[in-house]
Amino acid sequence: MGSRSGEQGKRMAELSKNLKEGERILEPTRRPDGTLRKPIRIRPGYTPEDEVVKYQSKGSLMKKEMASQGPPGYEPDPAPKPKTKAAKRNERKKEKRLQATAEKANSSEDGSASNGSQSVNVLASEMEALDVSSNNDVCGGAPNPGTTGEDVEKRIRALKKKIRLTEAQQQKTASRDLNPEQLEKFSKLEEWRQELKALEDKAA
């Protein structure tokens, strides 16, 4: 064992004598079985295989570059500038406005909840607005002698619309869900039909 180490020392001394400029010697390393490897002379400019930079194509380099920059079209925000007094004032105004609109929205939601139960009454209110005939006409009284042909046509159109809306509402809603106002409209349906017939006869 001692002779081997002596031999290694001699070999190292010989190699170091013959070294050229920039060369170096890698000392002997021990194998797993306990024996020593030979000392290695390393020429100048040599880089070990595992330290050599691997070749990368242009595409892979571009991918890496793009990944570091973020998605296409992305521009990082520049450093934020200190806000002026006017900008701060404007921000406060915006916040107040947003709070006011949020409060209004909350109050309107509360109101809409109460209006939700009255959604069935919308058609009824439309029919009230279309009320054209007076009580005398409904009872079968003769229309005003001064009415022109255009007035009669308008009345006929209005009555047809009222009848159509009432019939549509009658089909949509069940009889048990009706409120008194709707029941009244349905009871007037036959009277409106009679009035319409009378007006159509008169127009003819």
From Swiss-Prot:
Key words, A-Z: Cytoplasm, mRNA transport, Nonsense-mediated mRNA decay, Nucleus, RNA-binding, Translation regulation, Transport
Question: What GO biological process term is on the record, naming one?
Answer: regulation of translation
Per the record, which residues fall in region Disordered? Answer: 1-121, 133-153
Which Gene Ontology terms of cellular component type are present?
Answer: cytoplasm; nucleolus; nucleoplasm
Motif (Nuclear export signal) positions are 195-200
**Subcellular location per the Swiss-Prot or TrEMBL entry:** Cytoplasm; Nucleus, Nucleolus; Nucleus, Nucleoplasm
Summarize tissue expression.
Expressed in root and shoot meristems, cotyledons, vascular tissues of leaves, receptacle of flowers and siliques, and pollen grains.
**Main location class:** cytoplasm
The observed outcome of changing L196A is: Accumulation in the nucleus
Specify the effect of L199A.
Accumulation in the nucleus
- Where is the sequence biased in composition, kind Polar residues? 104-121
Q: What are the recorded GO MF terms, alphabetically?
A: RNA binding
Keyword Heme set for record: no
What does the annotation say about its assembly with partners? Answer: Interacts with MAGO and Y14.
**What is the documented function of this protein?**
Key regulator of the exon junction complex (EJC), a multiprotein complex that associates immediately upstream of the exon-exon junction on mRNAs and serves as a positional landmark for the intron exon structure of genes and directs post-transcriptional processes in the cytoplasm such as mRNA export, nonsense-mediated mRNA decay (NMD) or translation. Acts as an EJC disassembly factor, allowing translation-dependent EJC removal and recycling by disrupting mature EJC from spliced mRNAs.
Report what the protein is called.
Partner of Y14 and mago
